Amino acid sequence: MDEAQVLALLGAATPSGLDAILREVDAARLFRSVDDHVLGPRNRTALRDLLVSRLDDLGDEALANLAYGLQAGHTDSADERAIAAVFRARSGTGLTALKNQMNMRTDAHDLEGLVFVDVDDEQVREEILGHIAAQAEGLQIGEWKVLSDIDDTVVCALHDRRYPRGTIYPGVLALFDALDRGPTDTPFSLGDLTFVTARPRDALGLIENHTRASLRRAGIATSSVLTGGLINLVSHDLMAAKKVQNIEHYHALFPEYRLLFIGDSGQGDVVVGRGLIEHFAHVVDLVVIHDVVDTPEAERARLADEGIHVVDTYVGAALRCHERGLISER
């Protein structure tokens, strides 16, 4: 099928037919299959304009796939304006559902990557974030986004000598599942788990994709990942500062959700917890630190006074979460 036939097929599709096509097709390949010819028709532009003109015909899955198609590869200024139009196609809880759908990708092209990396026009980015903020105003989802470190929090990796390296900590996956389902086991959304790591982002997303693959092998099928940079590996304070910045981005993307942070005592996560309590006290309900360095009782008590709760096991973490009404009794 040549480029003109692709455009004709999509242009003639019924609303339900177009939605079905955009749900099933690899949108990045679709956009790569057409071109703006130097001495011929500008078919890629025509494809983008056609799909943007029919945003009202598309469901959340199709809209998220369209945004991915515009995001993957080179994203020019017209693509970025089209991405902004995708966000404007939804309001209220409909926008929340669309953002969650966008964030379900299993590669580096998630919501944070879309808004804060691929959209590099600050005016367009502010337009997107302004729409998100306006639609979240007064919106009460009543759920939490769980933000978690990885090394020595989910997987024994660096400082902990109690388990073989690579061990998934007992109870951590069950706790993530309970937090995802919430206190009533009837959540508005599932997949509300995001990993905040100091591991650097690279241009091709290879490190992030490797991290996601490792998490899937550990039994975590759906999650998003917020990465750091090489400079942030220099010190624990720089690691912590990057994590707090990533969480600031995340809160800007999901202002209608409350937040919970789970980290460990080995790599600056206590500093992250302090930063969250300082800057996001209005939405952060709990900071839990998994102890891997034998934190003394006096220090634990002092941290608890700051709102940072140190635990030895994920049974202890679950008790803290239940006390705060974050998980059900089941």
Predicted region positions:
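A short, conserved beta-to-alpha structural element at the edge of catalytic cores
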Residues: 174-186, 282-318
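A short acidic (Asp/Glu
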Residues: 157-159, 204-210, 269-276, 297-300
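Non-catalytic pre-domain segments flanking phosphatase-related domains
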Residues: 1-148, 327-330
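Divalent cation-coordinating acidic motifs and surrounding scaffolds
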Residues: 165-167, 192, 200, 228-232, ...
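Glycine- and small hydrophobic-enriched segments that form the cores of compact globular domains
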Residues: 114-224
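Conserved Lys-Pro-Asp/Glu-containing loop-to-beta segment of HAD-superfamily phosphomonoesterases
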Residues: 255-266
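A charged nuclease-like catalytic/ligand-binding cleft shared by nucleic-acid processing domains
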Residues: 207-253
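Short, basic/hydrophobic alpha-helical segments
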Residues: 176, 180-184, 243-257
